[in-house]
Amino acid sequence: MKTRSKKTKTENNQEKSKEKNKFDQLPLDLEIEIFRRLPLKSVARFLTLSKSCAATIRSPSFITSFRSPQPCTLIASAPIFNCLHPFKPRVLVDHKLSFFSSSSSSSSSTSFLSRLTCPSSPYPRHMEYYCHYVNGLISVGYGREQIVTNPSTGRFITLPSVRTKRRLVKSFFGYDPASDQYKVLCMTERLYGHQEDPSSQHQVFTLGVKKPWKMLDRTTIPDHRPWTNGVCIDGVVYYIAKTGQGMSQLSLMRYDLRDDNLNVFISLPEEIRTPSLYSDTLLNYEGKLAIAIPVTSYIFDVWVMDQDGEKHEWLKKITFNIEPWQSSFDDIRIKGTTLTGEFIFAPMNNYCDDEFYVFHYKSQQE
């Protein structure tokens, strides 16, 4: 009489461990190639399979492996109030942000990624959502509430509330590739204060470190009031702010993630110091800091900072005219750039409920 052998629970666990070890022994480049061939939803499931899989998916090598000659553009879409003026608060109607990816090589290749429900507030018209994209993640700030999300997988984390009693909180987001760290920089302003009042209560939260918000030394930070969006390049966050006596000057601020140093980097020259500066004016153009200035609604000057020498200079790199688009859209803004040097445009106001438009423009100027 034959008897069927039964595997013990220990033996089953040992076999599963062996299978897992086989995957762990694969070369990193092969693991990355395997994950790259999977749908995004499958990649998201692997985040919870093992620490090894999660480490590979979150590694800079895996993130940068998606950089191709035809990269995708990340699009964040949401219905907002007060969208007719660039300096009015952008307040979400239903507290939802939808993320899409789009390829510049095909107008029909836009695909839905995920949707994020943001926190509500009893004072919705007094606060603005601040969104910043850095190295695969998006930081969304709304008053004291801060969220960091991965739009590709839909996963997100809610940070501890910013340490302040004020309702008006401005935020910036940065990534340091040297230490592989993400940080959120926040500062507060008085809700009904004057435009001459500087920001205060500057504090930093480091992702992945179980520590509270870190308050920066106020005595080391010059008086300033943020005026534009922020751009992170090589572990440094830049943004334009009002500085000087009565906040009458415009300067470029520099926040270094490595040592949490926040200071004035350089003053803006007269040619750039213009009322036409708006919230999305800073760009990362081919790895260099750039400023896009609308001469009119359809003519733009792009200035690029030259940091190669000891003297930092702003060079007028490109001037281009997109007036042929005037018949289709009332007002267009530069919203970003691609890794291949294309400029990304979008209408300031989208009057169609079920469609939105994004344009890629490749300048032929040197």
UniProtKB/Swiss-Prot annotation:
Q: Which NCBIfam families match?
A: F_box_assoc_1 (TIGR01640)
Report what the protein is called: Putative F-box protein At1g26515
- Residues of the region (Disordered) are 1-20
Q: Which Pfam families match?
A: F-box, FBA_3
- Composition bias of kind Basic and acidic residues appears in 8-20
Taxonomic lineage: Eukaryota, Viridiplantae, Streptophyta, Embryophyta, Tracheophyta
| InterPro entries on file | F-box-assoc_dom_typ3, F-box-assoc_interact_dom, F-box-like_dom_sf, F-box_dom
Q: Where is the F-box domain?
A: 20-66
